[in-house]
Amino acid sequence: MKAIRIHEDGGPEVLRYEDAPDPVAKPGEVLVSLRAASLNHLDLWVRKGLPSAPKPRILGADGAGVRVDTGERVVINPGLEHGAVITVIGEHTDGTHAELVAVPEENVFPLDDALDFETAAAFPLVFETAYRMLVTKARLQAGEWVLIWGIGGGVATATFEIARALGARTLVTSGSDAKLERAREWGADLAVNHATGDVVAAAKEAGGIDVVVETVGEATWARSLAAVKPGGRVTVCGATSGPNPPAQLHRFWWKQLTVYGSTMGTREDFLGAYELVRSGKARVHVDSRFPLSETRAAHERMERAEQLGKIVLTIPG
């Protein structure tokens, strides 16, 4: 089969579109002939060696295609549960940026007729992550305010869509005025340029933020704690700008804040997110499409933070 593999850690130049052995399904696994996959920041981190993985390695967590043994159209849940620990397909195992993948049978679900392969490949990891943060952890309610940093990335657009589907109000940020304008068209209640505008002032004018979706870390942490209202919740699933901001512990007791750490999700989180997508309550925003053979260009686009939504890889059947 053809696959995208890395033989060493590094930049997009280490990605190789090459022949690789067909995977063999172990007991409890099934083979999926992939028709589409998508790109996540996880793929960039694995490519760079965080976490370090045995080489060669096929990247990719998300995918949709045809189950080889039954011919059924399926979507893959990328989460691998190990008790309280959840890992991801393509992190410590070969992933979906290939023509074939072997995955646990319990991770394969029938693909709703309303969804095409590209949409199905675009939603799982980011929507499952967002669902766990907003619904399972923070228990977001209709009418509450959600602060979403960096609208444009997959998790940000997924949290926006789930918040909107639940009847919450959204304050989104970006360093790109063009992305903010698109977010307004999608239905964002407030959209602020975090490089030139005052996010905290906008939050206070709205009455304070009930739930902060924190994925950035050092660059936004202080403003997140200033923007959240007393009794509010901060959900953390990443720290793309660095993991060691000043803690500002006094804000936690004075405001009686609750902080939730979250990563990926359970089978139940996946199914909850899937229901929102297939019912049409939450939209899946696809930024761009690249043939599997052009995955390097897809990585370069994500590295430049040019995307607004998910980057999809198309795989000929």
Q: Could you tell me what each predicted segment is?
A:
Residues G232-C237, P246-V286:
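Rossmann-fold dehydrogenase core element
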Residues G152, F160:
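N-terminal Rossmann NAD(P)H-binding glycine-rich loop of SDR-like oxidoreductase domains
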Residues M1, R267-G317:
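C-terminal hydrophobic helical "lid"/dimerization subdomain
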Residues I76-G150:
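NAD(P)H dinucleotide-binding glycine-rich loop of Rossmann-like/cofactor-binding domains
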Residues V228-K229:
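Helix-to-beta-strand junctions that scaffold the AdoMet/dcAdoMet cofactor pocket
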Residues I151, A239:
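NAD(P)H cofactor-binding loop motif with strongest signal on the N-terminal glycine-rich segment
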Residues I148, R164-R223:
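Adenosine-nucleotide cofactor-binding segment
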Residues P21-L39, R47-V88, D94-G95, A102, ...:
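Glycine-rich beta-strand-centered segment in the early N-terminal region that forms part
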